[in-house]
Amino acid sequence: MPIRHALSTTNIALVAVFAGLIAASTLWPGAELVSGVPITLQTLAVLLAGAALGPWRGAAAAAVYLIVGTAGAPIFAGRSGGFAAWTGPTAGFLGGFVVAAFVTGWLVRSMRTRGQLTTTGIIGACAVGSLVVLNVIGWGFFTLRLQTSIPATAAIASPFLAGDIIKVFIAGTAAAAVHRAYPQLLGSVRSTARATESPAPVVVAATAGGNSVS
């Protein structure tokens, strides 16, 4: 992404809004299981940022959130903040937010570029970002930090699976609605693109003078 385009007012505003959304997701008190890993809405917000904004802006929103939280703002899980959050066993999930947002956004943008963007595809991208990328990084660090065995970590992680799946579907569906309302959010496409699988899809056609929406 060209630096001038990346630093445009629109992109900065979008990154700020979604960073704020991730921070706001921690206002829900959530719940904490015996493992000490909290159940929060952060993952949902991170996936939505990546799926809606694309890889770079989505990852930037997650990074801004982490920077502000590390600086001391009480916007991490449990309304905590500061560098101490990076010393615990759940630090891998914090770092994984940036990677998960990037991968989710990259998958969505790739489908968009090919003109194959559907609700199912966006949900699938969110599933990869959450169930594969974020879980591997987060639970992998958890295992190393506490020196637990992989089977033991799997047993601890299993109660979170149902909630993760629900958040994947919500984030994917919400992102599809965003792209249906703002079909140019991820830029131009090579051919006809659909933001949902509805009978009346949004069509974005490239013209010699720019992009037109019909």
Regions picked out by a protein language model, each given a short descriptive name:
Residues M1-A59:
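Hydrophobic transmembrane alpha-helices
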Residues I12-V17, T40, L44-L48, A59-V64, ...:
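Hydrophobic alpha-helical transmembrane segments
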Residues T26-P38, L66-A100:
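Interfacial aromatic-anchored transmembrane helix boundaries in multi-pass membrane proteins
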Residues A61-Y65, A73-F76, T104, I137-G138, ...:
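Alpha-helical transmembrane segments and their lipid-water interface positions
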Residues W28, A52, G78-R79, L107, ...:
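Helix-loop junctions at the membrane-solvent interface of multi-pass transporters
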Residues S35, M111-A205:
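Membrane-embedded alpha-helical hairpins and interfacial helices in multi-pass inner-membrane proteins
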Residues A52-W56, V103-M111, V178-Y182:
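Structural signal for the C-terminal ends of transmembrane alpha-helices
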Residues A24, F83-L134:
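Short helix-perturbing small/polar motifs within transmembrane alpha-helices
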